[in-house]
Swiss-Prot record:
Regulation: Allosterically activated by GTP, when glutamine is the substrate; GTP has no effect on the reaction when ammonia is the substrate. The allosteric effector GTP functions by stabilizing the protein conformation that binds the tetrahedral intermediate(s) formed during glutamine hydrolysis. Inhibited by the product CTP, via allosteric rather than competitive inhibition.
Binding site for ATP: S17, L18, G19, K20, G21, V22, D74
Reaction catalysis annotation: UTP + L-glutamine + ATP + H2O = CTP + L-glutamate + ADP + phosphate + 2 H(+); L-glutamine + H2O = L-glutamate + NH4(+); UTP + NH4(+) + ATP = CTP + ADP + phosphate + 2 H(+)
Pathway involvement of the protein, from the record: Pyrimidine metabolism; CTP biosynthesis via de novo pathway; CTP from UDP: step 2/2
Function text: Catalyzes the ATP-dependent amination of UTP to CTP with either L-glutamine or ammonia as the source of nitrogen. Regulates intracellular CTP levels through interactions with the four ribonucleotide triphosphates.
Family: Belongs to the CTP synthase family.
PROSITE patterns reported in the protein's UniProt record: GATASE_TYPE_1
Pfam family, one: GATase
Residue segments, region Amidoligase domain: 1-269
Protein name in the entry: CTP synthase
Residues binding CTP: S16, D150, I151, E152, K190, T191, K192, P193, T194, Q195, K226
Residues that, per the record, bind L-glutamine: G356, L384, G385, M386, Q387, E407, R474
Length: 546
C-alpha cells in the first residue's frame, strides 16, 4: 500500500444480511467509474481458517479466486461488480490471523512476550489489511463481517480503530450500514435501532462518518435530521439503501443520491465525473428481458439458495444476454427417484447438476442426468455434476452397473471417478494427495488451463483452443476408463494441459449435453456474461419453443 491510498471501512449493525457486500461492491463500482483503481477486502470473524470445509447451508457458497483461495461469497459480488480480480489477500478470517500469530510464537518471533489480542492479534489484522493492498491502488474498500456488538468482531473493529489513528482522517473513512425498520401498522420508520447501533460503535472508539440506512421505503429529510441529531453524523452523509428489483441497480441508486460524490469530497480524491453508461446498459438489458425459461437445478443444498450464489447469477446473466428471464426451479436430489423423476422435469427447459460433496442425494442426481440424456433435455453438469454424468454413462451405456466414485463408494470395484493423487499447478509446482490427507485446503484449487478438442461443441462455444477456468475438487475421471467411454460415444472435449486430467465431456448425439470439472460460474459477470452459460440458455430457449 502506498502513502496515498485511501481506505473505506464498511461495518454493519442491528442485524446481519443487510447487504454490506452489495453496498461495498456498489461503492467500488462508483469509484471505479470515476477512473480510480479500486480493490476490495472482506474480513470474516469466524475461527475457521477459511470457509472451505464449512457447510454451504451454514455459510453459503465458497467462492474460489484465480489463485486458488477458498473465500467468502461476497468476493463473488466484488468480482461481478468491479474489474479487479480478487486473490487470497482479499479475504482473511480470525482463524487465519490466529494461525499466523501462533506459528510465529512457536518460532520464537515474539522473543518470549505474552501473546495477547492487543497488540499481537490486532497488529496482525492491520498488517494483513495494509499488505493486501497493492501499491497502485487508489482506494481500498474493506468490509468487516458480522454485526457491531458481536464478540467475534471486536478484534477487527479495534484494529480498524487503530488504523484510523495511524493513517489519519484524510486517508480513512467509516461507512456504517444499519436497518431502519418500517412498521406498516403504524406507518412509521423507526430510527431507534440505528441510534443504538451507532452508539455501540462509538463505545469502542469508532465514529461513523457515513450512514447507509436499509429500509423498505425512502425516508424523508425529517427522519434524516433525527438520525443526524442522535448519531453525530452529518445529514448530507446519510444515505438510503432501498429495496430494488436487481442488485445491479444499487450503484445507480447510490449515484442518484450523490453517495460517490460525497466519498470523493470526504477523502479528497482526484477523480473525474462518474461514467456509468456501461452499468446503465447492464440494468437496461435486465429490464428489457421478454419471456421466461425454467432451469431445474438438482442439488442437495437447495434449501439455501445462497449455496449456489455464483451459479444462480451466471444463469441470470446468461438469460439477460439472451433476452429472457431465467427462473430456477430448485430440486432436492434426495426427493428424486425413478418413479417420480418425470414429474420434476416435465415443465423445465433444461437440467443442471451443480457441484457438491458427499453421497447424500447422489442417486437422485444420477437419475436426473439419465432423464436429461434419454429425453434430449439440455444438460449442464458442473464439478460433481460432471463426475456423476460419467458414472451414469458408464452404468447405462457401458453396462458397468456398479460404476461409482471412490469418494462416494470407497469399496467400489469400478471407480470411474478416483482421487487425483498428483497434479501440476499453473506455476509448475507438483501437488500430491492421498486418501488420508487433510480435507481443508488440499483440493485442486484455482485457475487451470484446459485444452479444447478440435471440432467439439465446447471448442465451438468458447471460440478458442484453450481456456482457463477455476477448479475446486479432489476427484477426477479415472483415466483407465477413458478409452472405453470414448468408444461408447462420450467425448472428452477438454483436457488438462498435460493431457492427464479430463476437464470437459459432451455427447455429440444429444441436443446439448455438456459437463465440466471446473466451476465456470466464478468468472461470469453481468457485463460480459459467460459463453458456456449463454450457449446453455440458448439451448434451453430452443427446447422450450419446441
Amino acid at each position: 500500500m502506498n502513502s496515498n491510498t485511501k481506505i473505506i471501512f464498511v461495518t454493519g449493525g442491528v442485524v446481519s444480511s443487510l447487504g454490506k457486500g452489495v453496498t461495498a461492491a456498489s461503492l467500488a463500482t462508483l469509484l471505479e467509474s470515476r477512473g480510480l483503481n479500486v480493490t476490495m477486502m472482506k474480513l470474516d470473524p469466524y475461527i475457521n481458517v477459511d470457509p472451505g470445509t464449512m457447510s454451504p447451508l451454514q455459510h453459503g457458497e465458497v467462492f474460489v479466486t484465480e489463485d486458488g483461495a477458498e473465500t467468502d461469497l461476497d468476493l463473488g459480488h466484488y468480482e461481478r461488480f468491479i474489474r479487479n480480480k480478487m486473490t487470497q489477500a482479499n479475504n482473511f478470517t480470525t482463524g487465519k490471523v490466529y494461525q499466523s500469530v501462533l506459528r510465529r510464537e512457536r518460532k520464537g518471533d515474539y522473543l518470549g512476550a505474552t501473546i495477547q489480542v492487543i497488540p499481537h492479534i490486532t497488529d496482525e489484522i492491520k498488517r494483513r489489511i495494509c499488505s493486501g493492498i497493492a501499491d497502485d491502488v487508489d482506494v481500498a474498500i474493506v468490509e468487516i463481517g458480522g454485526t457491531v456488538g458481536d464478540i467475534e468482531s471486536q478484534p477487527f473493529l479495534e484494529a480498524i480503530r487503530q488504523l484510523r489513528i495511524e493513517l489519519g482522517r484524510n486517508r480513512t473513512l467509516f461507512v456504517h450500514l444499519t436497518l431502519l425498520p418500517y412498521i406498516k401498522v403504524a406507518g412509521e420508520i423507526k430510527t431507534k435501532p440505528t441510534q443504538h447501533s451507532v452508539k455501540e460503535l462509538r463505545g469502542i472508539g469508532i465514529q461513523a462518518d457515513v450512514l447507509v440506512c436499509r429500509c423498505e421505503k425512502k425516508f424523508d429529510d425529517s427522519e434524516k435530521r433525527k438520525i443526524a441529531l442522535f448519531t453525530n453524523v452529518d445529514q448530507d452523509c446519510i444515505f438510503t439503501a432501498e429495496d430494488v428489483d436487481t442488485i445491479y441497480e444499487v450503484p445507480l441508486k447510490y449515484n442518484q443520491q450523490g453517495f460517490d460524490a460525497k466519498l470523493v469530497e470526504l477523502l479528497n480524491l482526484n477523480a473525474k465525473e462518474a461514467d456509468l453508461s456501461e452499468w446503465q446498459n447492464v440494468v437496461n438489458t435486465i429490464r428489457d428481458v421478454k419471456g421466461e425459461v425454467i432451469i431445474a437445478m438438482v442439488g442437495k443444498y437447495v434449501s439455501l439458495t445462497e449455496a449456489y450464489k455464483s451459479l444462480n447469477e451466471a444463469l441470470y446473466n446468461a438469460g439477460y444476454k439472451k433476452g429472457v428471464k431465467v427462473k430456477i426451479k430448485f430440486v432436492d436430489s434426495e426427493d428424486v427417484n425413478e418413479n417420480n423423476v418425470e414429474s420434476y422435469f416435465k415443465d423445465v427447459a433444461a437440467i443442471l447438476v451443480p457441484g457438491g460433496f458427499g453421497s447424500r442425494g447422489v442417486e437422485g442426481k444420477i437419475i436426473s442426468i439419465k432423464y436429461a440424456r434419454e429425453n434430449q433435455i439440455p444438460f449442464l453438469g458442473i464439478c460433481l455434476g460432471m463426475q456423476l454424468a460419467v458414472i451414469e454413462y458408464a452404468r447405462n451405456i457401458l453396462g458397468i452397473k456398479d460404476a461409482h466414485s471412490s469418494e462416494l463408494e470407497p469399496t467400489t470395484a469400478n471407480p470411474v471417478i478416483g482421487l487425483i493423487t498428483e497434479w501440476q499447478a499453473e506455476d509448475g509446482t507438483v501437488h500430491q494427495r492421498t486418501h488420508s490427507s487433510d480435507l481443508g485446503g488440499t483440493m485442486r484449487l484455482g485457475g487451470y488451463k484446459c485444452v479444447l478438442k478440435q471440432g467439439s461443441r465446447a471448442r465451438e462455444i468458447y471460440q478458442a483452443d484453450e481456456v482457463v477456468e477455476r477448479h475446486r475438487h479432489r476427484y477426477e475421471v479415472n483415466s483407465n476408463y477413458v478409452e472405453r467411454l470414448e468408444e461408447a460415444g462420450l467425448i472428452f472435449s477438454g483436457r488438462s494441459e498435460d493431457n492427464k486430467l479430463m476437464e470437459l465431456i459432451e455427447i455429440p448425439q444429444h441436443k446439448w449435453f455438456i459437463a465440466c470439472q471446473a466451476h465456470p460460474e466464478f468468472t461470469s459477470t453481468p457485463r460480459y456474461g459467460h459463453k458456456l452459460f449463454e450457449s446453455y440458455i440458448q439451448a434451453a430457449i430452443e427446447n422450450s419453443n419446441n
